[in-house]
C-alpha cells in the first residue's frame, strides 16, 4: 500500500506544470502543503506545518515545512527542493513529459541509446520531468 501511495504522489507531482523560476512553482508548493495538511498528524498539530515565504523572491515562492514531534530529544530533518527540469529537453515528447504513463507509451516508438532502451523495457524506472 505504501509503495502505491508513493507512486501516486510522484505521478501527481510530475503532472504539475511548474517550470523553474516562474510563479508556476507555487502550484507544487500548494500541493505539498495540502499533502501535509491532509495527514492525520498535521490535522492534530496544524501549527507544525506551513509555508515560509522566501525573502525578496520575485516569484513569491515559499519553502514548505512540516515538523513531527516525537519522544526523543534527537531531531531528524529532511530537506529538499521542488524545482523541475524544463520539459523542452523532451523534444518531440514535450507535450507528454508531465504524464508518466503517456510518456512511457510514446517512448516505445522513439530511438533511444542501449542503456535507456534497457531501462525502459525493465519497467523499473519512472519517466517524466
Kindly give the residue locations of the regions a language model identified.
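N-terminal capping segment at the start of a domain
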Residues: 1-26, 30
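Long, contiguous hydrophobic alpha-helical segments, chiefly transmembrane helices and signal peptides
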Residues: 10, 28-32, 77-85
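Generic hydrophobic, helix-prone segments enriched in Leu/Val/Ile
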Residues: 13, 25, 49-51, 84, ...
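A non-catalytic alpha/beta surface segment that caps or lines the substrate-entry region
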Residues: 19-73, 89-100, 125
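Active-site metal-coordination/substrate-binding segment of hydrolases
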Residues: 74-129
Amino acid at each position: 500500500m505504501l509503495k502505491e501511495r508513493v507512486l501516486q504522489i510522484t505521478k501527481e507531482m510530475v503532472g504539475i506544470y511548474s517550470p523553474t523560476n516562474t510563479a508556476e512553482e507555487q502550484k507544487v508548493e500548494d500541493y505539498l502543503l495540502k499533502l501535509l495538511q491532509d495527514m492525520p498528524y498535521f490535522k492534530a498539530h496544524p501549527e507544525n506545518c506551513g509555508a515560509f515565504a522566501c525573502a525578496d523572491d520575485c516569484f513569491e515562492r515559499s519553502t514548505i515545512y512540516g515538523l513531527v514531534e516525537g519522544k526523543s530529544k534527537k531531531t531528524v530533518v529532511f530537506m529538499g527542493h521542488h524545482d523541475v527540469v524544463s520539459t523542452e529537453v523532451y523534444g518531440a515528447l514535450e507535450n507528454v513529459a508531465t504524464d508518466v504513463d503517456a510518456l512511457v507509451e510514446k517512448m516505445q516508438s522513439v530511438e533511444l541509446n542501449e542503456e535507456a532502451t534497457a531501462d525502459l523495457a525493465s519497467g523499473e524506472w519512472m519517466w517524466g520531468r
